[in-house]
């Protein structure tokens, strides 16, 4: 399933990409409201990192909205950790 955006945003984490040559750039971790999958009883929860990386909208799925949300939070945390390693620890 391809998503154009996270939809209704339920949480935002603001981070800064530190650059020694100038002011830091804002990076946002967005978490969308879980929704039921089309034609299915399971749910998905969209998330996106804006301001660094590829900025694509991703999602995690679960048997209900709670599990989808829980998995999305965990996956988003891992993706931020990987991105920070790629950026050599400049994400704060």
Q: Model-derived features: where do they sit?
A:
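A short, charged, amphipathic alpha-helix used as a generic interaction element across diverse proteins
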Residues: 69-77
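N-terminal intrinsically disordered, cationic/polar leader segments
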Residues: 1-63, 78, 84-92
